[in-house]
Every structure is written in structure tokens, then in C-alpha cells.
Amino acid sequence: MIDIAAVAGCDYVKFQKRNPNICVPEHQKNVIRDTPWGKMTYLDYKYKVEFGKEEYDEINRYCKEKGIEWSASPWDMDSLEFLNQYDLPYIKIPSAMLTNEELIIAARNTGKKVILSTGMSTWREIETANNWLIHGGEGPKQ
């Protein structure tokens, strides 16, 4: 993906970061799934496909080598904290997390640019998230 984006003249590539133990619902964690690695629980599968520090260090190194910047969307507070170890140009909040006040305010407090994804959100949810982003939870209430 990085190579294709660099050749195409893109400025950034974006990944996603999740803590599967937080993001996988309890009722799905032990469900057995067929995966490319055989049968395993859904939680084990999600851990297998999730990038860790080694992979993100390589992404960081390779993007620098290719002259392209990168970022990632954190799906939980652990992931935001993890991503803060990198010099990311922005943080993109996934649309599924647009109603997560704690995550949006914490992203705001990093001092980095924050992009809010709004797919499938109501206008009220967008306005509320925007207020959290602008006012850090201290601003106008709806």
C-alpha cells in the first residue's frame, strides 16, 4: 500500500489501530471462526491480524524512506496512547467512534490535527463530536 501510494503521488497512507480485547464484543470473543490460519476464536483472529509495535515501527521507517507520511485511526484509548509514540501529522477518528467523547477529547489533547469521520452519523452526533473537539467537553451542551 505504501509503495502504491508513493508512486501515485499521495501525501499520506492511513492505517487503523485497535485493542481487540476492548473492541471485540464479549459475546463474540470465543466464537470459533474459519480463518486463513485455521479455526480459532474471533478474539485470537483479531489479535493475529492486528499490527503491533514491530509492524508500526516498520511502517514508520518505510514511510520515511519512501517520503510519504502516515497516520492511523485509533479505535480505543489504548490505541491512541500507542500511536502517540509516533510523530503522526494527524489523528483520524473512525466514524464508528464519533460518539466516544473520551477518545475525541483525548485526541484533541494530543495537540495534533484531528479529522472526524462522519459516515452513517446523524447531524446531532456530528455537532456533538465537533463541540467536544472544539471545546474539549467544556463547551456548549446540546
Locate each region found by the language model.
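Catalytic domains of carbohydrate-active enzymes, especially glycoside hydrolases
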Residues: M1-R18, Y86-D87
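Anion (oxyanion) recognition and catalysis
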Residues: A6, K64, R108
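Glycine-rich, proline-tolerant flexible connector loops at the mouths of alpha/beta enzymes
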Residues: D11-E50
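Hydrophobic faces of well-ordered beta-strands that scaffold small-molecule active sites
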Residues: V13-F15, W70-A72, P89-I93, V114-L116, ...
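Active-site-adjacent beta->alpha loops and helix N-cap segments on the catalytic face
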Residues: C23-Q28, K53-Y56, S79-E81, I93-G111, ...
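Active-site beta->alpha loop and helix N-cap motifs at the rims of alpha/beta catalytic domains
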Residues: T35-A96, N100
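Short helix-capping segments at alpha-helix termini
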Residues: E65-K66, H135-K141
